[in-house]
Amino acid sequence: MLEGMSLGVAPRQTDVFATTTSFCEGRVAPDSIYGLLHRECFGLFPDEMFADLFCDVGRRSVPAMIVAVVMVLQRIEGCSDREAVERFTYDVRWKYAAGGLGFDYPGFVHTVLVDMRARLAASERPDRIFEVVLQTAKRAGLVGRRRVLDSTALYDAVATMDTVTLVRSAIRGLLGACAADLEGELRGLLGRDDDYRTAGKPVCDYDDPAEREALVHALAEDARALLGALDGRQLTAAVARAAELLAAVVGQDLERGDDGVFRIARRVAKDRIISTVDPDARHGHKTSARGFDGYKGHVAVDPDSELITATKVTAGNVGDAAPAPDLLADDLPDPESAGDGEPAAAVESALSVYGDSAYGAGALLDTLEQADAQIVCKVQPPVAPAGRFAKDAFAIDLEAATVTCPAGQVTALRPLSDGQIARFGAACTDCPLAARCTASPDGRSIRLTAHEAQLARARARQSDPAWKADYRATRPKVERKIGHLMRRAHGGRRARVRGQTKIDADFSLLAAAVNLARLAVLGLTHQTATWAATSA
């Protein structure tokens, strides 16, 4: 026999005085993103903040503050547009986060979110949600002068195409972009028995080399015929873009042999387009052994508050150091305003920048040195094949423009278009250390980049034990933040949209949502005329 317990009876009358606020108080944690948005949504995202996106007359929109809150929650929970509006309608936490709306507050159609994204994209401040959240954190004193940089792979939302599919899809795209009259004219030039109206790979016995080669050549001839007919014409923007894409695809993947037959090129183009559906996507590598297709999401993080201070999305084949100046643009001194001869450090503390060896590029080091920043970016040591003498075994005197080898031979540096070179030549012939230095019959040569001095200074800095301790204690914090961004609950690494511009905006919105979740933990509150963090 179980212990005594009376039967619970379901209530048949609701509490007509209950609100989302009274219901959620005590149930929703105050340090959750829902609790923060409930308290501060009107201060963070006032309707006036979006006034420039709308007209002065016309049908009233859904309140912009509510849409902004839904967009933030949608991004941090990884919802589709339809899922987001459904949760706003039925999940009480979402209405609580939007200022404590009533249980019966009406929902809206998912196209409202599509429309708001389009309006933001067409505005002068497309990333204003991220900017406002970051500015709020700065006013609360949560953003210091240290930045950690890193990047992560973002997988594209399309299938990677092989050469045959790529060329055929580009032809199909060009025909589809043309007006009816021009399309009819171009179709009369096609030689293949293919109307190019359906997507997919053409029928062919791909195991037969001759048939496969004939298909590739026929596709190339169709592409040449179309491009030749359009050459020199006044084209619409859409047709011009489609023609440029077709020309790029054919040029990167096909080459004409001496017999006049087009074949698939036995090389990989440097900036190869991998899909006509998303022409901005590229093959990328985070390591030599791990590749991906799509984009890179770059972030700058404050390691003390663990807030994201900047984001940038690039094609997957762009190096990590290339967008670093953009990530630091708001933190580096403005060259136009720095004309008083007084260093930036006199106004505020010097900027400290941390990064792994991907950020140890000479051009970035030069930019940071000119900004008087403290550089904590790792630089790879020079290497040589088969364990031979590396560059650091040579004494390089940039002022005297000479290089001294381990055997004591001295040679002059000669200028190149992108740096300098020292060639030892005949001096290596009878050198007792030649076997440990070079296998070239022309002797050893040492090539210097245009930023050799910056690289040398960086290598000297990173030999300091204090530098190493600071680097090891600080840089890994960005890895944890990237882990937060790439959680499966937020949508993971797979891009939700197509095109670099849209993915950039989506990544910025995700960073804003993650920052808000972090600010909630730090206890962000609005106190009279300013912001403060009670738990920082």
PLM regions and their residue ranges:
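Alpha-helical support elements that line or immediately flank enzyme active sites
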Residues: I66-G78
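DNA-recognition alpha helix
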Residues: A84-Y96
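A short glycine/serine-rich beta->alpha loop
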Residues: L53-R60, V497-Q500
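Anion-binding and metal-coordination hotspots
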Residues: S80-E86, L101-G102, P106, T111-A536
